[in-house]
């Protein structure tokens, strides 16, 4: 293919326009402008993606991978460790390391985790963060969403328990703002989702433009139809447009 080539290595193919395989063994690079940098049996079909390691697959564009046996199908993603996956609808996500982990949302970072599929007595543990956003222009509460706007509930799978820290910051059109922190624990027992105890809500600081006393903006977490919703409540007495952003940090055990 035009502009493609291999430099060193063994039995590798560079088939995409401007693609390359450099000192790589048995790799196949068919994505345009993609490159395999050393490694073994790397398969790259995503445009402008790159990777190292062995037996990794990258179908997402503008992505990078390392480690072994990983699959990166989300665009603008990053995947490392061993046998980890970034899903196709999870753009802008990353797995920093660990074993047998899979992303759940777009804009998610799995910092580390470990899933032992051979011994059911070994706990699955993971530490992850998902980034959040919302825009409000009225006085009604609204559900915050993932950064790509596609998901508005954050529920552990059956058999899992999450210890959660939620940070949300709001900024009004007049550049006034506020910030909140919420800590809570949620479990899923055979489809029945429960928040254990009461979420701890701390208003870290809040400008009066976001309301005062009973009219002040706030954040709530609750279970509706066995799904966890995070609601941002704008100022109640008058509509003030606001941008809301934050992240949900999860420590997960199953």
PLM-predicted stretches and their roles:
Residues 1, 25-27, 164, 182, ...:
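Intrinsic disorder/low-complexity signal
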Residues 1-145, 149-154, 246-250:
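Periodic small-residue-enriched repeat registers in elongated scaffold domains
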Residues 186, 250-254:
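Short, low-complexity, polar/charged sequence segments that are solvent-exposed and flexible
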Residues 117-162, 169-178, 190-241, 254:
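Surface-exposed ligand/attachment interfaces on beta-rich extracellular proteins
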Residues 181-188:
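Short beta-strand elements
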């Amino acid at each position: 293919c035009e502009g493609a080539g291999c430099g060193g290595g063994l039995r590798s193919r560079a088939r995409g326009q401007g693609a390359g395989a450099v000192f790589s063994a048995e790799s196949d690079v068919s994505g345009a402008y993609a490159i395999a940098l050393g490694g073994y049996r790397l398969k790259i079909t995503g445009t402008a993606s790159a990777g190292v390691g062995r037996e990794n697959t990258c179908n997402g564009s503008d992505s990078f991978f390392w480690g072994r046996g990983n699959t990166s199908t989300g665009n603008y993603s990053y995947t490392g460790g061993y046998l980890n996956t970034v899903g196709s609808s999870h753009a802008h996500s990353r797995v920093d390391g660990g074993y047998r982990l899979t992303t759940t949302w777009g804009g998610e970072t799995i910092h580390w985790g470990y899933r032992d599929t051979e011994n059911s007595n070994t706990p699955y543990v993971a530490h992850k963060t998902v980034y959040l956003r919302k825009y409000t222009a009225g006085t009604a509460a609204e559900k915050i969403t993932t950064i790509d706007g596609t998901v508005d509930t954050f529920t552990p799978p059956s058999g899992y328990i999450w210890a959660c820290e939620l940070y949300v910051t709001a900024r009004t059109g007049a550049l006034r703002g506020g910030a909140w922190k919420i800590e809570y624990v949620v479990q899923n027992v055979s489809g029945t989702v429960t928040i254990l105890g009461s979420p701890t809500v701390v208003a870290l600081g809040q400008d009066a433009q976001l309301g005062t006393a009973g009219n002040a903006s706030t954040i709530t977490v609750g279970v509706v139809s066995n799904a966890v919703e995070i609601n941002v409540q704008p100022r109640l007495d008058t509509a003030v447009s606001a941008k809301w952003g934050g992240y949900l940090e999860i420590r997960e055990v199953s």
